[in-house]
A protein has these predicted regions:
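Active-site-adjacent beta-strand/loop module that shapes the phosphate/pyrophosphate-binding cleft
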Residues: 42, 104-132
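Conserved Nudix-box catalytic region and its N-terminal flanking loop in Nudix hydrolases
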Residues: 50-90, 94
Length: 173
């Protein structure tokens, strides 16, 4: 059974589940296996790309906030399948499943959702090298943020705050 570590979010002081000890023990979210509506939980997948100690974020025109690229897991999809689809739609990137490496699972209030919904997100790391994704669909912009730059934003989405805490704990940002 995988162990769960806790980390304190320096922005709120609250504790949250930061990551599982091994991605090999991880069972990906699959929407067909859970009654998400009953639990008011939204299954999602997010992409983590770190370059020069900065995290790639995508600006959602719909929600007016910076997020991890990715999105909702549709019925019958695994988290990786959903992420590949979303990344193609949002960033014009054609990634292979082998490029995605499970990093962490986060759970946080889904920003801008009414009524309140919890987001459950499997996050996968990927290396792009010098390739810069292009914003498409509902994405208005993509850019890399250092932790200090992210902290200066007027809106800090809770899930992204958790990811930064994990990356900081691992010395990646």
């Amino acid at each position: 059974m995988p162990s769960i570590q806790k980390a304190a979010c320096k922005y709120t002081g609250r504790f949250f589940v930061a990551r599982m000890s091994s991605p090999y023990n991880h069972s990906p979210i699959t929407s067909q296996h859970r009654d998400w509506n009953h639990l008011n939980t939204l299954p999602t997948a997010g992409l983590i790309i770190v370059r020069h100690r900065s995290l790639l974020l995508a600006y959602s025109n719909n929600k007016q906030a910076w997020y991890l690229p990715g999105g909702k897991i549709d019925a019958g999809e695994t988290a990786k399948q959903a992420l590949l689809r979303e990344i193609h739609e949002e960033l014009a990137l054609n990634l292979d499943a082998e490029q995605l490496h499970f990093y962490t699972h986060i759970s946080a209030p889904a920003y801008g959702e009414t009524p309140a919904v919890m987001m459950a997100q499997d996050c996968f790391r990927c290396e792009l090298g010098d390739v810069m994704p292009q914003a498409q669909a509902e994405i208005g912009a993509v850019r890399y943020f250092t932790l200090a730059e992210f902290q200066q934003l007027d809106t800090q989405v809770a899930g992204v705050v958790q990811v930064y805490a994990c990356l900081q704990a691992d010395g990646l940002v």
